């Protein structure tokens, strides 16, 4: 919602101010299609050159994430803590043998299937199961496990940030591409140097539309979208760190309740359930 409001404000203020200042939209309307084809087409081509197919798909998905916002909400954080509580409690009370059935086939696990949204995220499931699998193989050094988890998180986060970096790269190039379009317009104008001043003025005005479009697209649309996507990715990345915090706390010998409380402390403030809310969720999950 807010990105759409922001776009409306950007367009309204820029073009509304131009209109109130007595600007003539005919020049913009007449020149914009060709200028946009040159600038937008060149920017798209540069994006294709600098990315492989997976990268381009990521950029496409990233644009939709700009509009939809972070993937994980307050309930999802609560569900994640409840899931980790049940798994660590099972491991603590019944041992690794009872846990193996859940981590080897999470799609058939009664515990995992309580949380369908979490199960749809392959990284969440794989990250939890792979780490617990390491624990069942007697890798119980908290520092080694934490180091291994941190490397997985860094790799995943680096890959997740690629669409934002690609969009930012496009934004950085748009002003220069706008200048390219403007220069081509000036070249065209110089070929008609014998025309009367009013004709030359119109042609120069059309050429400058290219500079305007390049800067406007860069700083009014694409750049802010890249910043928003970066913020969304960073916020979603906090979700996966909760898994690390809870499982490392469990390896340090803490009870399941204490481990998830440590994880709750790492939840972003706007998403953080209260102690009472989490306790109620854990009780409900255990009884289910």
Residue ranges with predicted function:
Residues 19-163, 235-288:
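Large intracellular
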């Amino acid at each position: 919602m807010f990105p759409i409001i922001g776009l409306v404000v950007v367009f309204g203020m820029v073009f509304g101010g131009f209109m109130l200042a007595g600007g003539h939209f005919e020049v913009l309307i007449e020149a914009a299609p060709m200028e946009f084809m040159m600038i937008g087409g060149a920017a798209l081509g540069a994006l294709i050159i600098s990315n492989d197919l997976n990268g381009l798909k990521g950029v496409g998905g990233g644009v939709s994430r700009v509009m939809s916002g972070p993937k994980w909400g307050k309930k999802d954080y609560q569900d994640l803590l409840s899931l980790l509580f049940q798994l660590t409690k099972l491991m603590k009370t019944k041992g690794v043998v009872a846990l193996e059935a859940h981590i080897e086939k999470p799609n058939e696990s009664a515990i995992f299937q309580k949380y369908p949204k979490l199960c749809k995220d392959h990284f969440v499931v794989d990250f939890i199961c792979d780490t617990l699998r390491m624990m069942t193989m007697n890798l119980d050094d908290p520092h080694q496990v934490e180091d291994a988890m941190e490397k997985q998180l860094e790799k995943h986060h680096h890959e997740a940030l690629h669409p934002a970096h690609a969009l930012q790269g496009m934004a950085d190039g748009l002003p220069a591409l706008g200048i390219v379009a403007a220069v081509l317009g000036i070249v065209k104008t110089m070929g008609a140097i014998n025309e009367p001043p009013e004709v030359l003025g119109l042609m120069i005005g059309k050429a400058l539309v290219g500079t305007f479009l390049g800067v406007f697209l860069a700083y009014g649309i694409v750049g802010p979208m890249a910043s928003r996507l970066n913020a969304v990715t960073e916020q979603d990345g906090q979700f996966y760190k909760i898994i690390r915090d809870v499982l490392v706390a469990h390896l340090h010998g803490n009870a399941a309740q204490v481990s998830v409380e440590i994880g709750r402390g790492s939840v972003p403030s706007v998403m953080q359930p209260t102690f009472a809310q989490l306790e109620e969720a854990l009780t409900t999950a255990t009884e289910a």
